[in-house]
Regions:
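Glycine-rich phosphate-binding loop of ATP-dependent small-molecule kinases
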Residues: 1-214
Length: 214
């Protein structure tokens, strides 16, 4: 079972990807993890990626696809995998499909976790991080015992720049411009399934399981 998780930043697709991977005993693959693993191991692809990352540049699509295809070719992916955070654009999706076709593979599902922008801005605006140990909380969903104070180390909590409404809005604009077209792409491919991401985490997971089959 080969699955792509789609959804805006903060929609909760990463959480669901981990839950799917655990239930179906298939790897949860994110491009960030692939980059880190290849750079740490000093692979040829990792060295190439590092030259871009060190300069603060985006890793070119061609190289990202090579890294992803190399990862999904590994033994632990023979029964399937969940791709989280890739592809992000139509060119990436086309390049991935082409590379998989050459291996005699194709994606089975693209699951879009659909959450309205205003919900995401509200959700992410409620996140807080500890200045001391980095532990994360949420004012509504995972509050601290004492308001504004970390349960773990007692230091103060802050709203990270990444979670400020103006930053989230910019990220959502980029998502709608670059990634939203993938909805049409995978609809045309006949593999898109859209789920309501505003429901409880466990309800959402159950809805995804019903699509994938127990």
């Amino acid at each position: 079972m080969k699955i792509i998780m789609l959804g805006a930043p903060g929609a909760g697709k990463g959480t669901q990807a981990k839950k799917i991977a655990a239930k179906y005993e298939i790897p949860h693959i994110s491009t960030g993890d692939i980059f880190r693993a290849n750079i740490k191991e000093g692979t040829e692809l990792g060295k190439k990626a590092k030259t871009y990352i060190d300069q603060g540049l985006l890793v070119p699509d061609e190289l990202v696809v090579d890294l992803v295809v190399d990862r999904v070719n590994q033994e632990d992916c023979k029964n399937g995998y969940v791709l989280d955070g890739f592809p992000r654009t139509i060119p990436q999706a086309e390049a991935l499909d082409k590379a998989l076709a050459e291996l005699g593979q194709k994606m089975d599902y693209a699951i879009d976790v659909d959450v309205p922008d205003e919900n995401i801005i509200h959700r992410m605006g409620g996140r807080r991080a500890c200045v001391g140990c980095g532990a994360t909380y949420h004012l509504e969903y995972a509050p601290t015992k004492v308001e504004g104070i970390c349960d773990v180390c007692g230091k103060e909590l802050i709203l990270r720049d990444d979670d400020k409404p103006e930053t989230v809005k910019k990220r959502l604009d980029v998502y709608h411009e670059q990634t939203q077209p993938l909805i049409d792409y995978y609809t045309n491919a006949g593999i898109l399934k859209t789920v309501d991401g505003t429901v409880d985490i466990d309800v959402l997971f159950q809805n995804i399981v019903e699509i994938l089959g127990a």
